[in-house]
Amino acid sequence: MIWLNSYLFHLSLICFYYHNCILTYAHLYIKTRKCTIEASYAQQKSVFDTSTPLPLNHEGLGLSFSSIFLHNSFMNILQKIFTDYYEEIKYTLHPRNSEMENIDKMINCGNPAFGGAMYGCPHCGNLKFVPFRCHSRFCPTCGNKYSMERSTSMSFKLINVQHRHCVFTIDENLRDFFLKDRSLLNCLFHSVTSVVSRMFFKLNKSKNFTPGFLMVLHTFGRDLKWNPHIHCLISEGGYSDDGFWRNVKHFNYTYLRNAFRTALLNELESCLGSSFKKIKAKCYSDHKSGFYVYAKPNKCDPKNVIKYIGRYLGRPVIATSRIDKYDGELVTFHYNRHEDEKYVVETIPAMDFIKRLIRHIPEKHFKMIRYGGLYARHRSIDSKLHRTIHKSKHHFYRSFNQWRTAILSSFGYDPLLCSECSHQMEFLELYYNHQRVSLEELYEKAMSKSRGKRSSA
């Protein structure tokens, strides 16, 4: 026991020594890299006005940096609409806390006053300021990036089999219940989970076949009106408890419709009590063949799984490309009608447009994406299943979601290539509230935090 304690003590000393060596090396690298870039800028200082201090000095930001701020301070059309009606939204609509939080984030997305990263070209001295983003799912820019990241994460879970995309819809008379009490949205997930699991269990009760399925809640239709429904991606097959896989090509949609109607109405009655019985009876009489459950005509091919999920499951409420016109009072937007794919152009007052949008902002920490069956459990027997994307390729696919690579793949240009000489631009410094935050300062903060943790331990 004594030799074990001695061994652990010496091991901790070695780890502590190497930890300090790595941090010291990182500090030296930062200082060396910064000096190299500063020297390069000093050689190229003729490109700057001689009366303007160099961007990298510690006296101030200089005129050149101010011009960069002015160049980047622009709003997209959605930010303009919400900025114009901000007071009216806040004091007449009385939005929920989560709505107001996301509106504030979206309006200030890309605002240089909230900080960003400065890049410079060591070859010609050209500067580029990249502002921080808001990371709100409500923001069309950040929401799209969030969708890309979630689509990639979801695709990593999928088994290498064909998947069926089913959509579970509800009676129009039930929609207001979910709008008034958003906790009821959980009932949709519970109902779909029980129905899909039951359908596969009935294939062979002794084998207990379990599918893999993921569910995404959409609260909006194409016209932006409140229409909660579940998109569900279901594996065309199930895995038994003894490790046997069974392919399932036929889905019983009659069963799915009736079972989903029954499961959802029972869930709602248990939450709402006896006051819901009249509505429940009306739903049964109006929908004798069950709630509408349909499958998308094109299946989710394992080879194109990320693209498929991103297109159908992970999209934000509205893209700015769908907003055609805003004149300060009216907003014109377009969509393809779901029933017949007809192109529809709609013009409505700006406040009505805002109301339609903000109601789709979920409560904080509410999970819009959930996993069921094989994708929700972690059993050793499930590790034998082959995934669509092998674990060794996860890092490669995640790299496409980094902001630089995402812009390059989406728009065909590299944001960190100098616009003047096409050389690679270098990261210089961070800025927050128009003030420089040096890498040395960040290093010192990290070191002090590390020392604090060691002393408390």
Model-derived segments and their meaning:
Residues 15-17, 21-39, 45-457:
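Beta->alpha loop/short-helix hinge microenvironment recognizer with preference
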